[in-house]
Amino acid sequence: EGKDVVIIGGGDTGTDCVGTALRQGCRSVTQIEIMARPPVERASDNPWPEWPRVYKMDYGQEEAAARQGDDPRVYLTTVRKFAGGAGGNLESIVTVEVKWQRNDKGIAVPVEVPGTEQVRPAQLALLAMGFLGPEQSLLKDIGVACDARSNVQAEYGHYATSVKGVFSAGDCRRGQSLVVWAINEGRGAAAACDRFLSGK
């Protein structure tokens, strides 16, 4: 209540944090998103039936816009520093804009834009950083097949990957989703591992 709240992450969890901060009576809410603002309409590299990667305001952003007058998200931005005051409590954060560039391995990485630093008031920071896919280096090292979205290929209900004895579940298998799916799939994958190890 009465705090400037900064949420770091632009996904579903970040949206929930925006809505919760507003309902708890925050003074202001800002949502930091390292990715670019999506286009209003589908881009040519995002055809149907793929999930549409388009700009939308979810309930949290709509509530913030109704109260503050605008979408609380700040795109292409990352946090460089947390600054404290008396007693060691958070007082502000320092943000900087980023641009995405391909590194020498062809992987898109965020690069800070010099001269774009901004100090933002913040007495509360919530980390809600999103999921951009499973860690690829380990999967490549052991030869696990992935789909076009970089998720591990493993059929729902069986969880076995392309490598014998390796199983996958949750966000790693299905992509970013709800924790209830991760719990459900974790149990299913544990049962699949048990069947594999016991030879059933």
Label for each model-derived stretch:
Residues 1-11:
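Beta1/beta-strand and adjacent pyrophosphate-binding region of the FAD-binding site
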Residues 1-2, 101-176:
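FAD-site-proximal beta/loop scaffold in flavoenzymes
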Residues 7-8, 95, 127, 168:
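Redox-cofactor binding/interface segments in oxidoreductases and associated redox assembly factors
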Residues 10, 33-37, 171:
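Cofactor-binding loop segments of dinucleotide-utilizing enzymes, especially the Rossmann-like FAD-
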Residues 13-17, 37-41, 81-83, 100-103, ...:
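Flexible loop/turn segments at secondary-structure boundaries
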Residues 14-19, 24, 169-199:
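A conserved FAD-binding loop/helix module that cradles the flavin
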Residues 18-81, 200:
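Rossmann-like dinucleotide-binding cores of NAD(P)H-dependent redox enzymes
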Residues 76-89, 96-102:
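A conserved short coil-to-beta-strand element within the FAD-binding core of flavoproteins
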